[in-house]
Amino acid sequence: SNFTYSVQQNAGSVTPPAGYTNYLGATVTASNSSISSGTAIGLRHKIEGYNIADLAWGTSSAKSVTLSFWVYSSLTGTFGGALWNSSQALSYPFSYSIPQTNTWTYVTLNIAGPTSSTWVTNNGTGVGIDFSLGTGTTRLPYSK
């Protein structure tokens, strides 16, 4: 079946990484040994189109970006997510490694500017970012 989780600022008693006061934490509150086959569970953040307009995504002048973040987990392994446009017709799946448990790890991903598809440059969702917390066997983590 599925698992449930809670999301909150400064979850548990984990100290934020050096230089930070807060973080967004997800804590599993009930788990089962499997996730339903077509299920994807994760965290989603939407960035307004005005904030990405200068990237010129969807044109031949598309600029590359760097996505960087801190991650902390009680599990090691390879994890993933995706950047996507508002129609979800195009996405950029990514993966990253957590090499050590219960330690903050800094992740940096370089993303080539997409030259195709439509990217909103108004007050709608310009780009979305998903971080996968778990996927079923027939579902890729947030890829199109």
Predicted segments — roles?
Residues S1-K144:
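Extracellular and organelle-lumenal recognition/adhesion modules and their flexible linkers in secreted
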